[in-house]
Amino acid sequence: MKKKIAVLLVTYGEVEQLSFTHLYPNAWRILHLITSRIANLPLPLKAFIALMRTLRRRKEWKRLRYQPKLAQINRKQTTALAKRLETVKQLADCEVQFIVRDAYYFIKPYYENVLNEVEAIADGVIVVPMIPIESDFACGVGCYLTLEHFGDGVFERVRVIKHLWNNSNFIALCVNHIFEKLEAHRERKVGLALVAHGTLIKDTNGEEPKVNTGYKETIAFYERLKAAIERDRRNSFASIKLGAMNHKFGGTWMTETLGRALEEFKAEGIEEVVIFPFGFLADNSEADLEAVMEVQQAGYPLQYIPCLNDSPDFIDWLAERVALSATQLVQPQTFRQTQIKKV
C-alpha cells in the first residue's frame, strides 16, 4: 500500500505586505513563541512591544524601500523540493508519495495549522527546519509545537531533519556555493564575513541561559566552514571572520559581531568585504538588508553572496536527506536491519 509522507519546510517567515494587519500578528507571534521562552512578559507589555516593533519596522522598511523576499524564496524551495521528490516512487520496498508544504512560525500558513491539515492525509511527517543552526529559538519551536500536537505518538509518525551545521556534505555544499558565486578581484585584499543570527550568552541576571541559544552550534559551524574554505584551492580570502547580527535586549549577546569583524578587517588592511549568510538558508532582512547596510556604512566595496535559497545542488542534497528520513518512517525495522548490516 502506498505511504503518504508530508514534508514540511518550516522557518520563521517575514511579511510580504508592510501593512499593520500583517506586521502586528508577526510581531506578536515572535514575542509569544520566542521571547516568552526567556522572559515572562505581562500581556499589556507584550502588546505594547508588538505595537512599537510593528510601527518601527513599517516606517524603516518603507523608508528604505525594502521588499522582503524570504517568503517568496521559501515557496520556491518548497516547489523545487516537491518536484525533485516526485521522482522518488519507492523506498525500502514501499511505494511512497510525498506531500510537500511550506509552514512558518511568524506568518501564515502557521506551522501548527499546516500540521493539522496534513495529519489527516499523511502516514508520516518529516519536519525540515530551514535554519541550519539548532537552538530552542529555531528548530526548538517546531519541536515544541510538534510534541504539543502529536503527544506521545510523535516518535512513531514524525522525523525531524537536524544537524545541518555538523554535516560534512552540507558544509562542502556551502563552500562550493561561495566560490561559484564569488567575483574574484585579485588586485584587492578581500575579507569574508560569515554572517549569522547572534545568540545570547548570558541572561538579564548575568547567568548562562537555561535554554539552548545555539551559541556553541554557531561557533562550531563557523569554525568548520572557515576551515573548509581555507583548505579549498580556490581560496584567496585574506581574512575570514564570523559576523553575528545581535539584538539589543534580553541579556548579553555574543561578542563575535559583524561590527567587530569590520573593525578587525580595517586593522588588517582589508579593501573589500564579501558577505555570505551561512546561518540562513534563504535571503532575509537580517542578511540582505541589515548586514549589507552595516558593511556599506563602514565604507567597504561589497559583494553579497546569496544564501543557498533554491539552488539545484542544495535541493538535491535536501531531497536525499528527506528520502533517508522517509525510509525510517515507512520501514523502520527494515532500516534498522540495513544499518546493522552496514556496521
PLM regions and their residue ranges:
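Active-site-proximal alpha-helix that buttresses catalytic centers in soluble enzyme cores
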Residues: 2-343
